[in-house]
Amino acid sequence: MLKPLLKEVESLTEKIKESDHEIEQIARRDYPETALLEQVSGVGPLIALTFVLTVEDKDRFQKSRDIGCYVGLRPRRCDSGQSQPQLRITKEGDPYLRTMLVEGAHYIISRRGPDTDLKRWGLHLAESGGKRGKMKAVVAVARKLGILLHRLWVTGEVYEPLRNHNLRQERKKIAA
């Protein structure tokens, strides 16, 4: 009874591996800029290719921060007099790219994700966020991940995972 199911699972797993390999080949051959984006932990060929194909033109935005609005990872605002509540995210823009960025953010914040400034920031948000802190942190990290990917694409810089941490350490040495 289980043998046919196991064979089906093996067959599907093999098809997924073939598709992943094909996506990787397309990214390498037709979109070399994806290699810049894959420097970030949590970003593989699928997320990088989705980002490049969705945004299309790296010069489309004046500021990298605008990516958050474009993808729908910006909190909805409803200002009224003195009150400025932060509501849920807008969910405007491409839902597939938003999903991919959130998946990458889940990996970054998880235990398996390597130590980076983005992970430290996300974990700090999760700890100080109360009941829903982890989910809010994931969305915030997804937004920052989109901003980071756009910035790397525009500048062509090499990604430094602990850039802010290293700068703080250097400042402490200078001050001491």
Language model features: what each stretch is:
Residues 1-176:
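A detector of single, family-specific signature residues
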